């Protein structure tokens, strides 16, 4: 019984991670076309500030999903 619950939870985490990654990329492509040339010229090692914040957001969401899964699994096992 717990095996099925854990499998479904892991599957839902993968779906939410892939959905958040897709929206982060879509947000990046839509905002990158509207930035000015002076902003693009202020790159650090080839990564613009927009890429940096999008990447940090995705990492934060992945960490949040992992911690939430651990807490939910430990709550279900009790």
UniProtKB/Swiss-Prot annotation:
The chain crosses the membrane at residues 53-73. It is found in: Membrane. It is a single-pass type I membrane protein. Residues 1-19 form the signal peptide. Its main location: membrane. The keyword Lipid metabolism does not apply. Keywords: Glycoprotein, Membrane, Sialic acid, Signal, Transmembrane, Transmembrane helix. The N-terminal extracellular domain is heavily glycosylated on serine and threonine residues. Residues 74-78 are cytoplasmic. Erythrocytes. One of its GO terms (cellular component) is plasma membrane. InterPro entries: Glycophorin (IPR001195). Belongs to the glycophorin-A family. This protein is a minor sialoglycoprotein in human erythrocyte membranes. This is Glycophorin-E. The gene is GYPE.
